[in-house]
């Protein structure tokens, strides 16, 4: 009987600790210290929500900055109203497999075909490979700059203006030394459309 009482007490203590105290305290801390991130970092302009600055979106139109490759075809996973149910997933292909090599070669050819005049330039790796999650919101500065001529031509803008927007939404290295500078794809595209004006 003593063991049963101790077991029930342990269940109650851990239920209160793990089911109430821990979730409430982490939620309160997140709302106090990281309010924007805890609420999804949603980009909202004039009451309209355009997406999260922490999640990648697929842009395929030539007038937009393209992000990293997404592994799921959004068109395949829509509800009855046409709303996407799934945007991406990780790739399970081994980097050493022939199938992966073929896939990357196809992506390289596609990128080259849309970015004329850059045949001799190496394509930044993040334009032809996907990330672990498949939802990276950022690309490297090199990947963004590689696309400037195409975007400027499609939108009838100056290369300098497109570069200016890319520079505006480029973030530095973490703590100034880790990683590399990155460009937020959604923010650049919203700025190109004249929606985001910071």
Swiss-Prot record:
Q: Which GO terms describe its molecular function?
A: ATP binding; P-type potassium transmembrane transporter activity
Specify where it is mainly localized. membrane
Q: Which GO terms describe its cellular component?
A: plasma membrane
- For the keyword Transmembrane helix, the answer is yes
Membrane topology type: Single-pass membrane protein
User: What InterPro entries does this protein map onto?
Assistant: KdpC (IPR003820)
Cell compartment(s), UniProt: Cell membrane
Residue ranges of the TM segments: 8-28
Keywords, in A-Z order: ATP-binding, Cell membrane, Ion transport, Membrane, Nucleotide-binding, Potassium, Potassium transport, Transmembrane, Transmembrane helix, Transport
Question: Which protein family is named in the record?
Answer: Belongs to the KdpC family.
NCBIfam families found in the cross-reference section: kdpC (TIGR00681), PRK00315.1 (NF001454)
Function, in words: Part of the high-affinity ATP-driven potassium transport (or Kdp) system, which catalyzes the hydrolysis of ATP coupled with the electrogenic transport of potassium into the cytoplasm. This subunit acts as a catalytic chaperone that increases the ATP-binding affinity of the ATP-hydrolyzing subunit KdpB by the formation of a transient KdpB/KdpC/ATP ternary complex.
Please describe the quaternary structure of this protein. Answer: The system is composed of three essential subunits: KdpA, KdpB and KdpC.
What name does UniProt use for this protein?
Potassium-transporting ATPase KdpC subunit
Q: What gene name does this entry carry?
A: kdpC
């Amino acid at each position: 009987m003593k063991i049963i009482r101790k077991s029930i007490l342990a269940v109650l203590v851990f239920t209160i600790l793990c089911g109430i105290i821990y979730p409430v305290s982490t939620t309160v801390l997140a709302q106090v210290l990281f309010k924007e991130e805890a609420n999804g970092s949603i980009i909202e302009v004039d009451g309209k929500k355009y997406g999260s600055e922490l999640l990648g979106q697929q842009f395929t139109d030539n007038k937009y900055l393209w992000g990293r490759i997404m592994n799921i075809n959004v068109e395949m996973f829509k509800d009855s109203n046409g709303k996407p149910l799934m945007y991406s997933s990780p790739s399970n292909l081994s980097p050493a497999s022939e199938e992966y090599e073929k896939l990357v070669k196809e992506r390289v050819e596609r990128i080259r075909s849309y970015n004329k005049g850059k045949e001799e330039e190496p394509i930044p790796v993040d334009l032809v490979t996907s990330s672990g999650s498949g939802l990276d919101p950022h690309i490297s500065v090199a990947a963004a700059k590689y696309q400037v001529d195409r975007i400027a031509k499609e939108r009838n803008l100056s290369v300098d203006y497109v570069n200016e927007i890319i520079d505006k939404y480029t973030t530095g290295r973490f703590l100034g030394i880790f990683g590399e500078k990155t460009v937020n794809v959604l923010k650049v595209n919203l700025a190109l459309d004249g929606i985001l004006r910071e």
